[in-house]
Amino acid sequence: MKFSVGDEVSVRNDWPEKRGPAHIRTPHYVRGRRGRVVKELGAFPNPEDLAFARPAAPRQLYHVTFPMRELWPDPASNDEVVVELYEHWLAAP
C-alpha cells in the first residue's frame, strides 16, 4: 500500500470522461482537492476496467475524508465528507 491512515493526499485533477467512454467512481467535486486517509479498505478489482469487461487488476481502496470547506465555498458547518477512492487517483500533496 502506498498510503497509510493519517496520510495527507491529493486527488488527481483528471477528467478521462472527456476523452471518451469512461466509468469513473471518483466524484468530480473531490478532483484536485486535498484530503486525509482515514481507513484502508483493501484491494479490489478496478471498476473502471470491469465496466468495459476488461481485465481488472486489484487496486487499493481507501476512505479519504475532506473538510467541507475544502470542497464548497460556503459550507453550512465544519463537517467532513468521506469518499471511497482508489489509489491510482491519489498522490502525495
Describe each region flagged by the PLM.
Residues 1-5, 10-93:
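Basic/aromatic-rich interaction segments and small domains that mediate binding to polyanionic partners
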